[in-house]
């Protein structure tokens, strides 16, 4: 195949990337929230490839190389089987394809839970091999020691509370969290613990809205909602979800484009032309001079 990736700074429908800007830093993201208020919400989307990163970069503050790539890219049933090798490869691609957004790479299941030292070894590998700005890990109070261990050693960490997909087997499914008083209190406590440990931002996923608002008001770092509340300090979605690539998406997803229909339609037209021998035409073939 002849297609190659090349960073294109021209502005067009196919390459909507403007002239290069200075890459955002983690301190700049953290400073978005001052005195408990975020003047400009943080925009984050997932990215898994260099080309996808190029298209999203100018519009985002953060690009998340999520372990959701297990389902989205590899067709796995959950994010649990995702490996550190997979995250490193995709993380490096996203960093190569971006120049503005700070890139955050998920730490996959089994790469950080055993001990803070294991987490440091995994996180330092991701930073070295990808050039990313930070890592993200799931878990609440139990992970606070690990978050502090990493941040004290120069590795910025984004936390993740509420519905944590890596714990889907324990949670029993992808249901909204925080409906009971006890569960709500635990989620708020988890977020406080991560913030106190030095997390530069916290993803709040799949919780009832009052809990997301309470966390946002309680912690000094930015909160980034996904199925949480518009009152969070920022928002994140899986890019393929909001582009309509899947028939079934969580209820918190807004579909901005029917890209699945566009791709399927283009493939159908191509197939029709190949079978009718109308492609390639004169414009797509080389003729003698």
Curated annotation (Swiss-Prot):
Cofactor info, note text: Binds 1 Mg(2+) ion per subunit.
In the record, biological process GO terms are: pantothenate biosynthetic process
Q: Which gene encodes it?
A: panB
Principal location = cytoplasm
Gene Ontology MF, one: magnesium ion binding
State the residue spans of region: Disordered. Answer: 1-20
* Family per similarity comment: Belongs to the PanB family.
Q: What is its EC class?
A: transferase
Give compartment(s).
Answer: Cytoplasm
Named cofactor requirement(s): Mg(2+)
Q: What does this protein do?
A: Catalyzes the reversible reaction in which hydroxymethyl group from 5,10-methylenetetrahydrofolate is transferred onto alpha-ketoisovalerate to form ketopantoate.
> Which SUPFAM superfamilies does this UniProt record tie to the protein?
Phosphoenolpyruvate/pyruvate domain
Q: Where does Mg(2+) bind?
A: 67, 106, 138
Domain of life of the native organism: Bacteria
The EC number(s) this enzyme carries: 2.1.2.11
What does the entry list as the binding residues for 3-methyl-2-oxobutanoate? 67-68, 106, 136
Q: Where is the composition biased (Polar residues)?
A: 1-15
* Active site positions: 205
Q: Which CDD domains does the entry link to?
A: KPHMT-like
> What is the name of the protein in this document?
3-methyl-2-oxobutanoate hydroxymethyltransferase
């Amino acid at each position: 195949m002849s297609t190659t990736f090349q960073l294109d700074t021209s502005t067009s429908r196919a390459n909507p990337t403007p002239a290069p800007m200075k890459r955002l830093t983690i301190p700049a993201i953290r400073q978005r929230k001052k005195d408990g208020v975020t003047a400009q919400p943080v925009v984050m989307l997932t990215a898994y490839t260099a080309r996808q990163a190029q298209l999203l970069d100018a519009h985002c503050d953060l690009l998340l190389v999520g372990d959701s790539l297990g389902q989205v890219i590899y067709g796995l049933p959950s994010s649990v089987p995702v490996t550190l090798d997979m995250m490193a490869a995709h993380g490096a691609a996203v960093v190569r394809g971006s120049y503005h957004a700070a890139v955050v790479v998920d730490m996959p299941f089994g790469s950080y839970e055993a001990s803070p030292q294991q987490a440091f070894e995994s996180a330092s590998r991701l930073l070295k091999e990808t050039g990313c700005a930070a890592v993200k890990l799931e878990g609440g109070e139990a992970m606070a020691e690990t978050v502090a261990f990493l941040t004290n050693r120069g590795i910025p960490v984004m936390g993740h509370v509420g519905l944590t997909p890596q714990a889907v087997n324990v949670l029993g499914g992808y249901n909204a969290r925080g409906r009971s008083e006890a569960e709500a209190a635990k989620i708020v406590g988890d977020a406080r613990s991560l913030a106190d440990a030095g997390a530069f931002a916290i993803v709040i996923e799949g919780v009832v809205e009052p809990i997301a608002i309470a966390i946002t008001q309680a912690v000094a770092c930015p909160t980034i909602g996904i199925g949480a509340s518009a009152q969070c300090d920022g928002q994140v979605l899986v890019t393929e979800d909001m582009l309509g690539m899947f028939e079934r998406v969580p209820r918190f997803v807004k579909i901005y484009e029917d890209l699945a229909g566009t791709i399927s339609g283009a493939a159908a037209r191509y197939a029709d032309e190949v079978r009718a021998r109308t492609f390639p035409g004169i414009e797509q073939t080389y003729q003698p001079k």
